[in-house]
Amino acid sequence: MMSSMESPEVRVLVFGLVTTAIGGAFAWLWITSLRVVYARAWPRGLRTAAWAFVALWALTSLGRVAARALSAPDVLYGPLTVTSTGTLLVVLLTTPLLVGARLLLRWLEARDRARLVERAAADVEPASREPSPEARVEAPASPARASTEVTHEASGFTRRALALGVVRSAPLAGVSAATFGLGEGMTDAVLNEVEMQFPGLPPALEGLRILQYSDVHLGQFIDLREIERLARLGEAAKPDLVVLTGDVADDLDLLPDALGLFAGIRPRLGTFASIGNHEYFRGLHKARRAYERGPVPLLMESGTVIPVGDARLHLAGADDPRFLGLQSRGFFESTVDKALDGGPSDAFHVLLSHRPEGFDAARTRGLELTLAGHTHGAQVGFAERSVLEPLMPDRYLWGPYQQGGSRLYTSSGTGHWMPFRIGCPREIVVLTLRRGPIDAPAVKRRLRLRA
């Protein structure tokens, strides 16, 4: 029997309350930082507007949690989600800037105090060296020194004014970034082709095209009409095989219809799926039932062998750990072993792992190709890579990767549960297999096809 904490509704409620509490901490830090940064320029109107903004976020966030827990219609849940997400993004984007501004202002104040102390010490001379009144003669001020002091004062004032101007523009910058990110997040998904070369690719698999959808998150921001458009766009790429690498739906009531639309692409080698963490989060039993009754097989710690001419393609699917922790490495090694169990050693192996961390276990076992998602590329990218790539080089956040003779592609996601993206568009990926040297870089290009 399912315990109360295993209920999807309870998990959604707990998750919503936890994220609201974290957001509340950021909101408090945001308000206090605004007060410090604006100091005397903190009029009642600005103070009222800031608190009203935080109140709007709090009310819509709690309302969204309640609406989800009570299964409220989308006509109510949608506006609450958009408003709470937009306001939270402004807070999250501006808080680091404002905290940095607080530190900068403290440094400026400490520097000014130190300079005042130095000047006071320089103006006080020892009494023993003080000349008699008769001998004291006022020397004219040096024009050069006077000019230098004025220049220093003006320079300090200019730097301070510039610094204050920059930090006080943080809220406007945050609103602009949030607006731009929300706008880009609501744009259509793009279709990218990625060519990868493998030295041992069987001739029968030369030019094989695998169409990958990942992290569609059907529900609040992605509806069935969008799924239909995505399926048509993918069909225009003429794939041989279609794979869904987890997090297909947040609203599991819509999952059967979505699977029917993806299966309607009718690739010659079929359509297959792997599990994601949101299937667990929303209700694994319900998700598995949809797959069992639908046209798309779910590969969950299992695999299938697909004959392609005189070659064989072994397609395997890993499980998802739900949460990453100290035991995650062992989990991925175990789930990949189970997925590969019984697979022919002479086949070309493709692993579907919702999380790209499964690639480390796959490459140590000699798998040629792993397809993953989950990260959404952090939803902010530059030059086809996540902006967090330098900080997390071993997390495989977005794009093609290679380790030894194994390759990985991590999708930026076909959908999202939060419609915010900058330089990291939603994508459908067509992976084309080529025979060639393993050290040849993957080639990625945009396909201009119409759905």
Tell what function each PLM region has:
Residues 190-193, 197-450:
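Soluble catalytic domains of enzymes that build or remodel membrane lipids, polysaccharides, and related
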